[in-house]
């Protein structure tokens, strides 16, 4: 749901935070998200500052997806150990959370702010929702306790239903509140609205009507938000977005 929101996958040509600043200047209401910032490749102080800045400039519309990264070739370029990304992710996650406090003072793998200085601006609501992507090299219980939501990958409906049920059970066992589940979906939208689904990488080539049915199935199993990716879309992107806005968005947005 929430198909009116805009998510940018890290790995675009543009730096995600620069791109978010541009989107903030050209939009007014839609949520802006990134899926996801690879925390071990960036210093968490810079992430906390950039994310808070984008949030303030957008009027509190930023949703921050975070991940440990899955591309081994990126780590040597920054002289960072790929096999330590899980621990570095966890430390970065905790560092970012603490930096949004007033005059933070704490010990961390990435540095030790001593309380004599502060980071400005702060996010509009005091902190940003951090949505953990995939496993991020973490224990599932840690993800359930610490993330404000979870971004996962497309799967068959039955398998996805089991995974979402397990995640929500872990949240409940930890005494946590309800949290949103997000999944990505690559879509190549067919001109024929009734065109049957044909698998593509992490998604389908299909018509509007099967897409609507599929999204309804995801909603039924507890997926709250689907990030549609048009990378493989063969039709004009502008006209495809218009079709989605007119035929799909009214049935799912804001629910």
Residue ranges and their predicted role:
Residues 1-255:
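Active-site-adjacent structural elements that line small-molecule/cofactor binding pockets in enzymes
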């Amino acid at each position: 749901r929430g198909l009116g929101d805009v998510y940018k996958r890290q790995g675009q040509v543009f730096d995600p935070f620069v791109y978010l600043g541009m989107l903030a200047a050209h939009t007014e209401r839609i949520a802006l998200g990134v899926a996801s910032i690879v925390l071990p490749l960036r210093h968490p102080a810079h992430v906390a500052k950039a994310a808070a800045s984008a949030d303030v400039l957008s009027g509190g519309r930023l949703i921050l997806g975070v991940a440990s990264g899955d591309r081994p070739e990126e780590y040597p370029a920054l002289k960072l150990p790929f096999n330590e990304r899980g621990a570095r992710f966890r430390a970065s996650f905790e560092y970012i959370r603490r930096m949004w406090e007033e005059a933070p003072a704490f010990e961390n793998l990435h540095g030790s702010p001593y309380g004599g200085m502060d980071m400005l601006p702060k996010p509009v609501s005091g902190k940003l929702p951090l949505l953990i992507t995939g496993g991020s090299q973490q224990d599932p219980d840690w993800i359930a306790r610490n993330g404000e939501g979870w971004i996962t990958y497309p799967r068959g409906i039955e398998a996805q239903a089991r995974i979402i049920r397990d995640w929500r059970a872990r949240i409940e066992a930890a005494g946590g509140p309800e949290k949103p589940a997000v999944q990505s979906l690559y879509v190549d939208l067919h001109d024929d609205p009734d065109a049957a689904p044909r698998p593509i990488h992490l998604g389908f080539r299909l018509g509007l009507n099967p897409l609507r049915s599929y999204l309804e199935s995801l909603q039924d199993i507890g997926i709250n938000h689907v990030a549609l990716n048009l990378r493989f879309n063969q039709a004009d992107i502008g006209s495809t977005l218009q079709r989605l806005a007119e035929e799909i968005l009214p049935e799912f947005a804001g629910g």
